UniProtKB/Swiss-Prot annotation:
CDD domains attached to this UniProt entry: GDC-P (cd00613)
Protein's name according to its UniProt entry: Glycine dehydrogenase (decarboxylating)
Function: The glycine cleavage system catalyzes the degradation of glycine. The P protein binds the alpha-amino group of glycine through its pyridoxal phosphate cofactor; CO(2) is released and the remaining methylamine moiety is then transferred to the lipoamide cofactor of the H protein.
Catalyzed chemical reaction(s): N(6)-[(R)-lipoyl]-L-lysyl-[glycine-cleavage complex H protein] + glycine + H(+) = N(6)-[(R)-S(8)-aminomethyldihydrolipoyl]-L-lysyl-[glycine-cleavage complex H protein] + CO2
């Protein structure tokens, strides 16, 4: 019997792990009278919010999804020929169902622990191999945020690698408009002089060149001589390119490019109104140590078997800080995995066949339009035609609108059309009919497409094979693909298997109801530069989510454009810099940053053109107020901002936060409060109301966008009213910035990774004000419960007043190194034998473990983790007492693979049973790490960042 839809929310107790009874048990165990009393003990009274958030009450999953379906239906799905870096594509259903919609893939964390990440590392290595192969360059990274930011990163890489002393970077006018705008924003912050022009007229003296290959408006140029001329003056040559086109045109590496960047979007990832999509970068070997982003490399494990891991990590912001190659932290791993698997699914013949078909259909369209008297401006092409439509332009656009077709309007007299793999002959005939109607002519039949490469000059046609590694020819059927994906997923630990207690990462539940809408066509199939009249549903979503986030944070304005937390930091600092400049204080360019801050903070400040001055921490892990005042006095009128993480990276609410904000404001500076730890404040404190001027939020932490193995993320930047005019500029439908905008864009799409904004929207709607506050309270309860239960076994390094922590705690394992020889890394690897992902290692304090359980983990899982940590402490005690060998023990040899434990001979100073099943529950449900401990140093000394030959795994 059917029943009426229930509008009451039962989601809150499904999102929050501990039941009411369990919460009561935990509160009693830590000596707190109630959740409210615990929050009073943890959160400073001066910042504690007592009034409930002005948000609607929690709603049911059915109600929220129906409402979102109504919102999505307001968007209009047109046939898109806009191109401009975004193209229609068919996501292979086997990838859609088994990767994008599979929590084994989307709930994983960045693969910093390689032994439990071999599946997604292999998928990323496929992606890197694909990019390096198609671009003809030596090495590729594991993804960047989008094409525009990849181009900006190419500019900074060129500056680091150039022999020229020139401050000029030349950018071709043939680049996509949005790329020009993002590069311009980056150049202004770094003091780089940008020259935009037509490269065919010669190059100025410059340190680097950025070309588009093929051109944004269709042409395919031969850049060999230009590259030689650039190299002759010491300049580095970068190009923005298209992976599908590279199946047919000469790889950039062969004609002289040093760096290639672009978007892998058209390899199986939908528009999503602009993202998320994986940007790519490849380069010559000489630039590898300066290349931004993560890099998957091949190494070996302790048994001598091939093993994958993240290579050359000393380049990254979490180690190099303001000297890092980039501020990038989160990238676009899930989307890079999908793009790499698209190549595996289609194989070299399939990818080339798709490219040939697109090029052939473009040629047929060109012939049909010529028959109508339309002048095609470009003599060369892959998928794009530039059409001189003159006074007929408005009529053609009107006819296109009637046919629900989007064309790219270049200006008042020119249109452009880009084809993709989804275009059918019927689509093409409808497109030709639109032009006939707009021109007032009779319809003409589309000529039969010809299997030729007439649009590509012979000099730049690709001669060699593509995707030559056997992995791209290994899949012959969907059965093969399904089993390959299962094999990869089984190698990894994600939230679908176990708690991931990573401090500063907030690995909470990514509920199925939150994920469902992202693949709805009304959200997934919208081009980022579609006319505003076609996207009212997205506008409602963006405006609604923006208002909710402003209410939650206490800020007045927000931009959802930044597509990572690091980009949000960058955008916030650009706003501060522009604000000071508008006030006639351009000298304010010093950013104060506590020594304990996450590495993205100083890296972002450097990108925004600021000098970094470090502020010391006191013995309790708080900002040293005396040192802060001394640094403020030291920099004087140069003070631009203070960046502070709150609660602190040490896992405590600093009591003096309002005093810190006041000191900065009195000196004329602005306060940037890093919102990475917002999961400890939602509903209990609002940074915009206790002294902060700007924050970024990590929607992939606090608001349930999954980490995806290292991306996607969304990092909105929220500001008080006086900074609102300086939020990132929003591009128009042509990808251009309003001349009145005070700050440029930080992402290529107007609203960043808009395609995943339904996730936080659904989360907030399902939780309501009360549920959001309760989630914060339970996150704090869970952290304090773990701290209390483990305090007798491992010292908790920092605590606030009343001995409480915030939403995470730092376990100090440093003394164990002296008493037993056991390090934080050894404990992390041993936890894998217990079926756990390790806590955060050595941040913010070297040699420690930082644990963040989140509100989504129930008491049973917390107890399982506590049991494992106590058992490991007992194993360490055996070493301390001399019962077990100091060098040959279960921790130093961890993790243990099945292959190790099934070896014919066993010579270790402990039994196999202890290695495999240290607690009884593992006999029922055991995760086996696929490789033993990975040798990181070997991998960096012998750098290989592409797929190994098959025989290497024999």
């Amino acid at each position: 019997m059917s029943r009426a839809p229930d509008t009451h929310s039962d989601f809150i107790p499904r999102h929050i792990g501990p039941s009411d009874e369990d919460q009561a048990t935990m509160l009693a165990a830590i000596g707190a009278a109630s959740l409210d009393a615990l929050i009073d003990e943890v959160v400073p009274p001066r910042i504690r919010s007592r009034a409930p958030l002005a948000l609607p009450a929690a709603r049911s999953e059915t109600d929220v999804l129906q409402d979102l379906k109504r919102m999505a239906a307001r968007n209009q799905i047109y046939r898109n020929y806009i191109g401009q870096g975004y193209y229609g594509t068919h996501t292979p259903n086997v990838v859609l169902r088994n990767v994008l919609e599979n929590p084994a893939w989307y709930t994983a964390y960045t693969p910093y622990q390689p032994e439990i990440s071999q599946g997604r590392l292999e998928a990323l290595l496929n992606y890197q191999t694909m990019v390096a192969d198609l671009t003809g360059l030596d090495i590729s990274n594991a993804s960047l945020l989008d094409e525009g930011t990849a181009a900006a990163e190419a500019m900074t890489l060129a500056r680091r690698g150039s022999r020229s002393s020139s401050p000029v970077f030349f950018v071709s006018q043939h680049c996509h408009p949005q790329t020009l705008e993002v590069v311009r924003t980056r150049a202004e912050g770094l003091g780089i002089e940008l020259v935009i022009g037509d490269e065919s007229r010669g190059l100025p003296e410059c340190f680097g060149v950025l070309l588009q290959y093929p051109h944004s408006l269709g042409g395919v140029a031969d850049y060999r001589e230009l590259a030689q001329a650039a190299h002759a003056q010491g300049a580095v040559v970068a190009c923005v390119t298209d992976l599908l086109a590279l199946a047919l045109i000469e790889p950039p590496g062969q004609w002289g490019a040093d760096i290639a960047v672009g978007s892998a979007q058209r390899f199986g990832v939908p528009f999503g109104f602009g993202g998320p999509h994986a940007g790519f970068m490849s380069c010559r070997d000489a630039y590898k140590r300066n290349m931004p982003g993560r890099l998957v490399g091949v190494s070996k494990d302790a048994q001598g078997n091939p093993a994958l891991r993240l290579a050359l990590q000393t380049r990254e912001q979490h180690i190099r800080r303001e000297k890092a190659t980039s501020n990038i932290c989160t990238a676009q791993v899930l989307l890079a995995v999908m793009a790499g698997l698209y190549a595996v699914w289609h194989g070299p013949r399939g990818v080339r066949r798709i490219a040939e078909r697109v090029q052939s259909l473009t040629g047929a369209l060109r012939a049909a339009l010529a028959g109508l008297g339309v002048k095609v401006a470009n003599d060369t092409w892959f998928d794009t035609l530039l059409l001189e439509t003159g006074v007929a332009t408005p009529a053609i656009l009107a006819a296109a609108d009637c046919a629900r077709i989007n064309l790219r309007q270049v200006d008042g007299a020119r249109l452009a059309v880009s084809l993709d793999e989804t275009v059918t002959l019927a689509d093409l005939q409808a497109l030709v009919n639109v032009f006939a109607a707009g021109l007032g002519k009779d319809e003409v039949a589309l000529p039969a497409p010809q299997a030729s490469l007439d649009g590509i000059p012979a000099a730049v046609r690709r001669q060699g094979p593509i995707l030559s590694h056997p992995v791209f020819s290994s899949v012959q059927s969907e059965t093969d693909m399904l089993r390959y994906l299962r094999k990869l997923a089984d190698k990894d630990l994600a939230l679908d298997r176990t708690m991931i207690p990573l401090g500063s990462c907030t690995m909470k539940l990514n509920a199925t109801a939150e994920m469902i809408p992202i693949t709805w066509p009304e959200f997934a199939l919208i081009h980022p530069f579609a006319p505003a009249s076609q996207t009212p549903g997205y506008r409602e979503l963006i405006d609604g989510l923006s208002a909710q986030l402003c209410e939650i944070t206490g800020y007045d304005g927000i931009s959802l454009q930044p597509n990572s937390g690091a980009q949000g930091e960058y955008a916030g600092l650009l706003a501060i810099r522009a604000y000071h400049q508008a006030n006639g204080q351009p000298q304010r360019n010093v950013c104060l940053i506590p020594a304990s801050a996450h590495g993205t903070n100083p890296a972002s400040a450097q990108l925004a053109g600021m000098d970094v001055v470090v502020v010391a921490s006191d013995a309790n892990g708080n900002v040293d107020l005396a040192d802060l005042r001394a640094r403020i006095a030291q920099v004087g009128e140069r003070l631009a901002a203070l960046m502070i993480t709150y609660p602190s990276t040490h896992g405590v609410f600093e009591e003096a936060v309002t005093e810190i904000c006041d000191a900065v404001h009195e000196a004329g500076g602005q306060v940037y409060l890093d919102g990475a730890n917002m999961n400890a404040m939602v509903g209990v404190a609002q940074p915009g109301k206790f002294g902060s001027d700007v924050s970024h939020l990590n929607l992939h932490k606090t608001f349930c966008i999954p980490h995806g193995g290292g991306g996607p993320g969304v990092g909105p930047v929220a500001v008080r009213a006086h900074l609102a005019p300086y939020l990132p500029g929003v591009l128009d439908a042509q990808g251009r910035l309003d001349p009145e905008a005070k700050v440029g864009p930080v992402s290529a799409a107007p609203y960043g990774s808009a395609g995943i904004l339904p996730i936080p929207y659904v989360y907030i709607a399902l939780m309501g004000a009360e549920g959001l506050r309760r989630a914060t309270e339970v996150a704090i309860l869970n952290a304090n419960y773990i701290a209390a239960r483990l305090r007798d076994h491992y010292p908790v390094l920092y605590a606030g007043r009343n001995g409480r922590v915030a939403h995470e705690c730092i376990l100090d394992v440093r003394p164990l190194k002296e008493t037993s020889g056991i390090s934080a890394e050894d404990i992390a690897k041993r936890l894998m034998d217990y079926g756990f992902h390790a806590p955060t290692m050595s941040f913010p304090v070297a040699g420690t473990l930082m644990v963040e359980p989140t509100e989504s983990e129930g008491l049973a899982e917390l107890e399982r983790f506590i049991e494992a940590m106590i058992a490991i402490r007992a194993e360490i005690a055996q070493i301390e007492s001399g019962e077990r060998d100091r060098d040959d023990n279960v921790l130093r040899n961890a993790p243990h693979t099945a292959q190790m434990l099934l070896a014919e001979e066993w010579h270790h100073d402990y039994p196999r049973q202890q290695a495999a099943y240290p607690v009884a529950s593992l006999r029922e449900n055991k995760y086996w790490p696929p490789v033993a401990r990975v040798d990181n140093a070997y991998g960096d000394r012998n750098l290989v960042c592409a797929c190994l030959p098959v025989e290497a795994y024999a």
